[in-house]
From Swiss-Prot:
Keywords: Isomerase, tRNA processing
Residues at the catalytic site: D66
Name of this protein: Probable tRNA pseudouridine synthase B
Organism placement in taxonomy: Archaea, Methanobacteriati, Methanobacteriota, Methanomada group, Methanococci
Ranges of residues in domain PUA: 233-308
Keyword NADP assigned: no
Its job: Could be responsible for synthesis of pseudouridine from uracil-55 in the psi GC loop of transfer RNAs.
Taxonomy, superkingdom: Archaea
Amino acid sequence: MELIVKEESKTDYNYGSDPYKRDIKTLLNTGLVVIDKPSGPTSHEVAAWVRNMLNLVKAGHGGTLDPKVTGALPVALGNTTKCVPIWHIPPKEYVCLMHLHDDAKLEDIENIFKEFTGRIHQRPPLKAAVKRSLRIRKIYEIEILEIDGRDILFRTKCQSGTYLRKLVDDMGEALGTSAHMQELRRTISGPFYENEAVYLQDLLDAYIFWKEDGNEEELRKLVKPLEYGLQHLKKIIVKDSAVDAVCHGATLYSSGVSKIEKGIGTDEVVLIETLKGEAVAVGKPLMNTKDMLKTEEGEVVEITRVIMEPGIYPRIWKKRNKNDKTKAESKKK
């Protein structure tokens, strides 16, 4: 990540805090944990277990896995639930065991896998909790790892919302053998990886250790601040004076910007951060990095989702009344 300074600015440490230095109670209400989901429970049940064991008001998972599917299941804790839609932006990766219902030649199998790379059409399965309309999904990568008789182990990197069970069914039909998904494990879920996923029992043990002995070290290793789940987004760093206005949903203006990440375009989602590294909001850039650096006034980011609660930073901005807005528009004309 390369940040370009638009205007040097200092932060006041009387307000806000470094995300990695939040007290443990705040962390539990503004954090996340990546669970290694076991086979059996639904994703909703796992999120509910996490909520109950950490004694939280709410928790939500970041991407449904069928009961028998295992792997990386990010769980948003407390107020972090508002970040869940942002986790769906990056691709997801799975390792799948596919079973053919008849014999097939290696060459034919390899050709079918090539055919199902790129843009594919999918209709959600009957059991899906969405409208069964035809949709386009992207298969970024698909790789055969091992073939043992009629069993094919493969890895795929795909767009969020891709139905792997349907992908296997469609490949089996195209191959002429028919097929079904025997096992599935999610290895990457957006910005989260399998190797950082933790077992439910380990999370419970760490929580009990903190509650009974006052030692929060193990719990801090497992629970990450919400900013950890937004690392995949390009950043715009704002001055302290702009934070509270953005927290109220105001458009970000050029005068409130301190630093801009290199390479921002108008076709992506960006993260608005404080000088301490706290997530404030996400939004749609109205111009690219180069133009943001040049402009001295005007709107630069349209806010689409506020993350930080208002009131953490001082309110320096003033509400514009309708008369002010009308006068400003008249001046433009």
